[in-house]
């Protein structure tokens, strides 16, 4: 993990033995099998989006388990893959178009660079084994990242899609921040509350109202 302004708050909050256990978990799992994302991208979300620049937090579940697809950013998918994109990112693009934003590619790195923390609750996944690392090591860390963002003074937007992410609402101070909850953008649930929820325009409205620059979701 590269040193960022997330580092010290995390070390202050987590148990003293957490980081040695985390390093042991990473070393062991990456030696034993095919794990995604690449080891140098595990913490890419907090490396690309410092706490001081974080305006929006989108919570995902875990990385894509297929080779070459996970980028260390929730929902982001390499632009080099033009076909067979995950249905969730396709539906996110549909909602963006509905809200007047035109984003043709599925790589969300430019969002992260604008202050959108694309945080998976579980940061690693074995090949073709979605959610297999849930409950192993990551949730104490990612829950604290959410709490640190919530405790920060600047108002933020927390976007929680689906039942898994919505459970994180209890970690967030709703009196200070905007919490946007909706169905997950997967095909099973997108038509039951994701489409038409307008998370992107609502986020920008809140940012402008609180004196912050809006996100260019088309990037």
UniProtKB/Swiss-Prot annotation:
Keywords: Cytoplasm, DNA damage, DNA repair, Hydrolase
Reactions mediated catalytically: Hydrolyzes single-stranded DNA or mismatched double-stranded DNA and polynucleotides, releasing free uracil
Annotated Gene Ontology cellular component terms: cytoplasm
Top-level lineage group: Bacteria
Signal peptide: none
Gene Ontology molecular function: any one: uracil DNA N-glycosylase activity
Pfam families hit by this protein: UDG
EC number of the protein: 3.2.2.27
UniProt-annotated location(s): Cytoplasm
Keyword Iron-sulfur appears in the UniProt entry: no
GO BP: base-excision repair, AP site formation via deaminated base removal
Main subcellular location of this protein, as a coarse class: cytoplasm
Active site per database record: 62 (proton acceptor)
TM spans (from-to): none
InterPro entries per UniProt: UDG_fam1 (IPR002043), Ura-DNA_Glyclase_AS (IPR018085), Uracil-DNA_glycosylase-like (IPR005122), Uracil-DNA_glycosylase-like_sf (IPR036895)
Family named by the database record: Belongs to the uracil-DNA glycosylase (UDG) superfamily. UNG family.
Protein name per Swiss-Prot or TrEMBL: Uracil-DNA glycosylase
Species per Swiss-Prot/TrEMBL record: Lactococcus lactis subsp. cremoris (strain SK11)
Gene transcribed to yield this protein: ung
């Amino acid at each position: 993990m590269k040193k960022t302004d997330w580092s010290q708050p995390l070390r202050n909050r987590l148990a003293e033995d957490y980081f040695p256990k985390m390093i042991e978990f990473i070393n062991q799992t990456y030696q034993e099998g095919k794990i995604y994302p690449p080891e140098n991208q595990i913490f890419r979300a907090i490396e690309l989006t410092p706490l001081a620049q974080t305006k929006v937090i989108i919570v995902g579940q875990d990385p894509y388990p297929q080779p070459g697809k996970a980028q260390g950013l929730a929902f982001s998918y390499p632009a080099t893959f033009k076909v067979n994109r995950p249905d969730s990112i396709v539906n996110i693009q549909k909602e963006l178009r509905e809200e007047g934003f035109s984003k043709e590619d599925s790589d969300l790195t430019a969002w992260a660079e604008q202050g959108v923390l694309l945080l998976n609750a579980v940061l690693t996944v074995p090949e073709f084994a979605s959610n297999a690392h849930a409950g192993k090591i990551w949730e104490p860390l990612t829950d604290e990242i959410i709490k640190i963002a919530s405790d920060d003074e600047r108002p933020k937007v927390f976007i929680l899609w689906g039942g898994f992410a919505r459970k994180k609402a209890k970690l967030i101070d709703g009196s200070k921040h905007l919490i946007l909850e909706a169905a997950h953008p997967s095909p099973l649930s997108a038509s039951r509350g994701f489409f038409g929820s307008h998370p992107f325009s609502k986020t920008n409205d809140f940012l402008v109202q609180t004196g912050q620059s809006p996100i260019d979701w088309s990037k």
